[in-house]
UniProtKB/Swiss-Prot annotation:
Record GO terms (molecular function): chitin binding
GO biological process: defense response to bacterium; defense response to fungus; defense response to Gram-positive bacterium; killing of cells of another organism
UniProt keyword rRNA-binding, yes or no: no
Official protein name in the record: Penaeidin-3a
Native organism: Penaeus vannamei (Whiteleg shrimp)
Length: 82
């Protein structure tokens, strides 16, 4: 079993050294996906920002957080601005 693992490692290392795997030269690390955002009460959320689409049903602290982080501020009777 160790022999098989060793041979697979050597074969993959040889391909990398010959440039068969990464033909573009320097390769950047793959970016991490954004963290999972839990939906807040009050409706669907916007893309990756964690703030509901409407101002209805969110707490004061959630509204203040969306306003300070993203500039999406709730106004009484008007909904979001910004």
């Amino acid at each position: 079993m160790r022999l098989v693992v060793c041979l697979v490692f050597l074969a993959s290392f040889a391909l990398v050294c010959q440039g068969q795997v990464y033909k573009g030269g320097y390769t950047r690390p793959i970016p991490r996906p954004p963290p999972f955002v839990r939906p807040l009460p009050g409706g669907p959320i916007g893309p990756y920002n964690g703030c509901p689409v409407s101002c209805r049903g969110i707490s004061f602290s959630q509204a203040r957080s969306c306003c300070s982080r993203l500039g999406r501020c709730c106004h009484v009777g008007k909904g979001y601005s910004g």
